[in-house]
């Protein structure tokens, strides 16, 4: 029975990974520009996003496996859950976590930078002429990646030798004493994880909070579309007015623009440019309404119009969910600030939850029927992931408030896609801490595990609460009953994260106060967005229309050149045959 249960849990995780591959593939396909696709960039981004999401979604598997050893109805371990069996489960989880975290670090710090420089070093002309070989390109990309290799080495060396916190503020609790690691290898990995979460926290605060606030509002208050009839009518009126003014100016000079004054010539040139822009807008409006397009596209546009009210309903539901998440995070943050037994000395670890958290309660109840909690957790992670993408798309990739790259559907360059992937990886690492320690701390640590708060007379014997159900209590780190340590098994994920904050308290302080900054940024953005009406970005629309026109001209020119070349080669062949 135990083997069947654990096998089913891992099967659900495998199905989730397959779903993640599909989600990552769709994300990359939707955002990358069609005319500048690179297989190496596409595969790297898909693999990196899948790996990191798989790391986060390992948490419900972790909770389900450790909870499977405990009978929450009786508050005791199941008969098959001997120390040997429990240690086997914990060891397998540790191996998977170490593998995924190491892979995440390598992808973010080495593979993505190398792929970036590999793409940058490509010279199409030199490659066609044979001047650039694969070896030359590899060495050029590797030379730039050496800097990142040095960063990784320095990072692990610092983590290897940096002093850890001493056992002065653990309150004498065995659970927290065990987290003070003396293994230098684990210390280096713990330090590296803490540093990456700290960097990701900055991105998480800026982008995820913004996206979480704007994603529901964008569904509720949709910006005007180019396909709207009133915008099309306005464009037609502006075009008629433009052409009428051109006729007036041309009538003054009888068709000879040299007779016009310099002011009128400048105005006429401006009107001609504006006319081209308005014609492009009109063509985009016609295409958006389905004119001149296939019946399938017209059917899709009509279906989209029919389901528009459901889009509004979905936005309202997402807004309510986001507000509940915000309230849950605020309640846990206040609980940590007031009831943490060691405060800043251990990164505000909360030994026992005293304030009700609605999201945490939902997860603990759902965890009793696996995989209900897994489905809810996956949806929660995907909500945060989509919010991060929306935040990056709206804010853009910036350096000192200067936008370097813009992330847009169908217009994202390979370089921007790689940078976005690296940012998402760091953001999701910070999300892993936030979900585990703030959004649902009880669920992420012990899940639905309980213990019988009754002393036993015999060493190794489990307490029996079958006739005293009121003594069955949820597991927590601050349990004073020594018998509970043999019943309650904390998740590996919570152990890793608590080890970071226990060994390096300054990381824990940054993580904790970063949650308040996240909550503040979310509140400011959501209030501002509710009072601000969305507008159509005409400049961006004109750039898209101009780009589409250029691509159409290039395609038609290429077809004409191909036809002319075929005609020439065909005539020469006929002359040889004759």
From Swiss-Prot:
Keywords for this protein: Cobalamin, Cobalt, Glycoprotein, Lysosome, Membrane, Transmembrane, Transmembrane helix, Transport
GO molecular function annotation: cobalamin binding
Annotated Gene Ontology cellular component terms: vacuolar membrane
Pfam families: LMBR1
Chain positions carrying an annotated carbohydrate: 70, 168
Biased composition (Acidic residues): 540-552
Transmembrane segments: 8-28, 46-66, 95-115, 145-165, 188-208, 312-332, 347-367, 375-395, 419-439, 506-526
Primary subcellular site in the record, as a coarse category: membrane
Top-level division of the source organism's lineage: Eukaryota
Compartment annotation: Lysosome membrane
Disordered: region residues: 539-578
Topology in membrane: Multi-pass membrane protein
GO biological process annotation, one example: protein localization to vacuole
Its job: Probable lysosomal cobalamin transporter. Required to export cobalamin from lysosomes allowing its conversion to cofactors.
Family to which this protein belongs: Belongs to the LIMR family. LMBRD1 subfamily.
This protein's name: Probable lysosomal cobalamin transporter
Organism annotation: Aspergillus terreus (strain NIH 2624 / FGSC A1156)
């Amino acid at each position: 029975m135990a083997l069947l249960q654990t096998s089913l849990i891992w099967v659900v995780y495998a199905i989730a990974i397959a779903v993640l591959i599909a989600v990552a593939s769709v994300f990359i396909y939707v955002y990358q520009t069609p005319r500048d696709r690179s297989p190496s960039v596409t595969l790297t981004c898909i693999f990196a996003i899948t790996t990191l999401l798989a790391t986060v979604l390992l948490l419900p598997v972790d909770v389900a496996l450790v909870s499977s050893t405990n009978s929450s109805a009786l508050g005791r371990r199941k008969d098959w859950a001997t120390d040997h069996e429990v240690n086997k489960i914990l060891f397998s989880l540790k191996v998977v976590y170490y593998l995924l975290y190491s892979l995440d670090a390598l992808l973010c710090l080495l593979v993505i930078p190398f792929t970036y420089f590999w793409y940058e070093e490509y010279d199409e002309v030199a490659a066609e002429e044979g001047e650039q070989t694969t070896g030359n390109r590899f060495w050029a990309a590797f030379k730039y990646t050496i800097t990142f290799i040095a960063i990784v080495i320095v990072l692990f060396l610092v983590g290897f030798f940096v002093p850890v916190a001493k056992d002065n503020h653990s309150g004498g609790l065995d659970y927290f004493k065990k987290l003070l690691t003396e293994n230098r290898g684990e210390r280096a990995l713990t330090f590296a994880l803490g540093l990456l979460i700290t960097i990701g926290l900055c991105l998480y605060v800026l982008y995820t909070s913004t996206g979480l606030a704007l994603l529901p509002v964008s569904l509720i208050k949709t910006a005007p579309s180019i396909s709207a009839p009133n915008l099309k009518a306005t464009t037609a009126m502006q075009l008629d007015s433009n052409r009428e003014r051109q006729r007036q100016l041309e009538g003054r000079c009888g068709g000879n623009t040299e007779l016009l004054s310099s002011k009128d010539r400048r105005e006429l040139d401006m009107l001609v440019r504006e006319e081209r822009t308005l014609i492009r807008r009109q063509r985009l409006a016609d295409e958006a309404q389905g004119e001149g397009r296939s019946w399938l596209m017209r059917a899709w546009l009509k279906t989209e119009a029919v389901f528009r009210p459901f889009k509004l309903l979905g936005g309202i539901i997402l807004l309510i969910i986001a507000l509940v998440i915000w309230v849950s995070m605020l309640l846990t943050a206040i609980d940590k600030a007031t009831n943490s037994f060691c405060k800043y000395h251990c990164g505000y670890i909360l030994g026992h939850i005293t304030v009700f958290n609605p999201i945490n309660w939902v997860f603990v109840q759902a965890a009793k029927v696996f995989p209900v909690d897994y489905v809810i957790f996956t949806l929660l992670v995907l909500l945060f992931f989509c919010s991060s993408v929306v935040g990056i798309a709206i804010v853009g990739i910036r350096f000192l408030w200067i936008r370097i790259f813009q992330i847009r559907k169908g217009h994202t360059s390979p370089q921007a896609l790689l940078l976005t992937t690296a940012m998402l990886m760091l953001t999701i690492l910070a999300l892993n801490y936030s979900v585990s320690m703030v959004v649902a701390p009880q669920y992420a640590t012990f899940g639905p595990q309980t213990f019988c708060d009754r002393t036993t007379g015999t060493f190794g014997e489990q307490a029996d609460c079958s006739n005293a159900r009121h003594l069955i209590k949820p597991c927590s780190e601050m349990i004073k009953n020594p018998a509970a340590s043999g019943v309650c098994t904390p998740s590996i994920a919570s152990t890793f994260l608590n080890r970071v904050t226990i060994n390096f308290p300054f990381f824990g302080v940054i993580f904790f106060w970063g949650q308040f900054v996240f909550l503040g940024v979310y509140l400011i953005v959501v209030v501002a967005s509710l009072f601000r009406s969305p507008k159509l970005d005409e400049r961006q629309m004109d750039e898209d229309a101009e780009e589409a026109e250029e691509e159409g001209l290039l395609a038609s020119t290429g077809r004409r050149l191909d036809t002319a070349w075929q005609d020439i080669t065909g005539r020469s062949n006929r002359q040889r045959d004759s």
